[in-house]
Structures are given as C-alpha cells and as structure tokens.
Amino acid sequence: MKIAIFNLPHLSFNRGGEKWIIKVASYLSKKHGVKVITTDSNKKYDLNNLNFDYIVIKHKKKYGLLHDISEIKSYLKDIDVTYAFYVWFGTQIEILKYSKRVIFGHHSPLDKPIQKIYYSLLENIIARKIKDSYHHFLTEYRANIYRKKGFKKIFIIPNFIELNKYKPKEKSYDKFKIICPGVVNIEKGIDILVKVAENLRKYDDIEFYITGNKPIYENLPANVKYLGLLNEDEYIDIISDKNLMFLPTRQEAFPFSVLENLAVGNPIVVSNLPDVISAFGEFESVYYAKLNNVEDYINGILKYYQIWKNNKDKYEELSKKAREIASKFDSNIILPKIEEMFKKVYESS
C-alpha cells in the first residue's frame, strides 16, 4: 500500500499534528510506502534521518485565506490512500481531485466563526461529496458533531504516546513546579497564566515553567520562567520532574501535552473543553477548570498543591493514576489501529 500524509506546516513546526505525522509515518513505513508532504510554512529547521520520504512544496496563497497546493498533484499520482489534515482552507478540493482514496484527519476543533462559515459552504455547497470521504476523529464528542451533519464514514482513534519514553521521576517536595507546555499565546491562554501566577505570588514554593516558542508577553511575573523551545529528550526530562501541568487553553482537540504529562505522572489542570473531557474522561488526577475563569484555574492548582504539601501518599497515588490514564493511549495499542484504518480504506474500493 502506498500512503501519502499531507499537512500544511513544515514538520519542524513540531506541534501535536507534526508529532503525530512523524510517529505514524515512521510506523507505517515499516510495511508500506509512505510519503509525507507539507509546505515550507513555519519551517524552523531542516529535518534529517527520517525513515520515510519527506516532500516539501512551496507555500502559496490563492487569495484571502485560501491556500494553493496545486503542486501536490504530481506527488499523488501513484498513491493508494491520502491522509490530509482537514483544517486548511482551500486544500480539500485539490486533495479530493488528485487522490484515489481520502481520509480527512480532524486534529483541530474548527469552532471559530470563520471556520464554521467556510466548512458549511464546503460541505453543503462547494464539495458535497466530501461527506462521502472517510474522516478520522480523535474523540467521540467531535465525531458525533459530524454524524449529525450527515457524515457516515467515520473512524475514531485517539492520539497516542510512546509510553516507554516517558518515565516518571521521583517528584520534588521543595518547590511545587508547574509546567505549562506551549502556553505562549492567547489561544493557549498565556493571559490567563499571567493572571493566575500573579495571584499565586504569595506562595513562595509555587513556580511556573513555560516551554515552546517565545511567549508573546516579554515581561512575565517573577514566578514564571521561560525554558525555550526544547527537543524531545530535553522536553521529557523537563516535564518529568514537575509536579503539575497547567493548560488554560481556549481551543483544543486532543492535546499531546496532556498525554505526555499524564505519562510522567503529573496531575493536570486544564480548561473544561468538551473535546478534552471526551478525550480523557473524568479522573481524580485531572481537574477541568471553567474556561477563562481565573478563580477556578487557581482552585484546581491549589487543590493539587495542598495535597502535595500535606499528604505525600495521596499525591503519589494521584501521580500513579495519571500514569495509568496515559497507559491506555500507548502507541503499541493505538498505532496498529491507525494502520488498520488505512487498510480498510484501501480495501473499500
């Protein structure tokens, strides 16, 4: 089977979608021919030593918000199944036009007003046959939204993690260290983080750490430290000795960062977005704070802080339960399901 995976950003952008592609393509390439195709948009650095073909095309715009990926045509000629991220305006028509079989991957909620307008036009007027394509969702919640729209060829397969790479370390009991991966812009909630951190400055033993691209705010509170853009090994090492993950995000489908932190035994305080709740379920190790509610985010943080400070055994139990949640998403369980999805689509016609 010959497979192509398309996404707009360069793989070096290194967010959840890019991580998903690299892991999936590496796994599938053991048995199948795999091409990954992206544009050079958001390229951070060159990538070497990949065990699949990586093709980078020039990022172009048609007009307005629409992207031009017409160059992709020549690379899809001999492909049996094309997997394309659904989020990019203007890309779906050419994917449908040049592909034999298509799976559209839904890795973003698409709930913004402009997205709702575009996809309503696309699905109901411009390209109605898109409902007859296969669609991959990360959560039952998001899949149900599309079932109500008339989509029937649906796969639900969650994100995954290489559990053996993420090992819990002995937790610190001198400082309560809170990791905030990717909380660098408004969508991820940096404004909320700043307000929360300022409110908690009276606690000398609470510290916040940000990883990822440079935050949009230059002057952060004294109890917030920016650690920079880390490679995978550095990132795992950093999160493993933290005590809590805090993610006040405003939009999320299935955050890899939550999965990674659960795997190293960190309890989580995250916004109560329906996709996230659907992804992980209700557990004592995860606190779903009311979206945009500074007070409730603080409530969640202080809940785990008090347990950490006053009841070490209970905190260790929560840490162990966090790891147990992550174990359900081990790549050894999920990656074969993704391969099976491709096989079913390949054999469908």
Each model region followed by its residue ranges:
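N-terminal strand-loop element at the rim of the active site
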Residues: N7-R15, I22-K23, Y27-G64, N272
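Short His-centered aromatic/hydrophobic patch
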Residues: A84-G90, H106
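Membrane-proximal helix-turn-helix segments that form the acceptor-binding/catalytic region
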Residues: I117-H135, K149
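Conserved donor-binding/catalytic core segment of Leloir-type glycosyltransferases
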Residues: H136, K171-K188, V194-A197
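Carbohydrate-associated surface elements
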Residues: Y141, F160
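Conserved acidic donor-binding segment of nucleotide-sugar-dependent glycosyltransferases
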Residues: L229, F283-E295, Y304-K309
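Aromatic "clamp/platform" in nucleotide-sugar-dependent glycosyltransferases that forms part
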Residues: R250
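Short hydrophobic beta-strand element within catalytic cores of glycosyltransferases
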Residues: P267-V270, I277
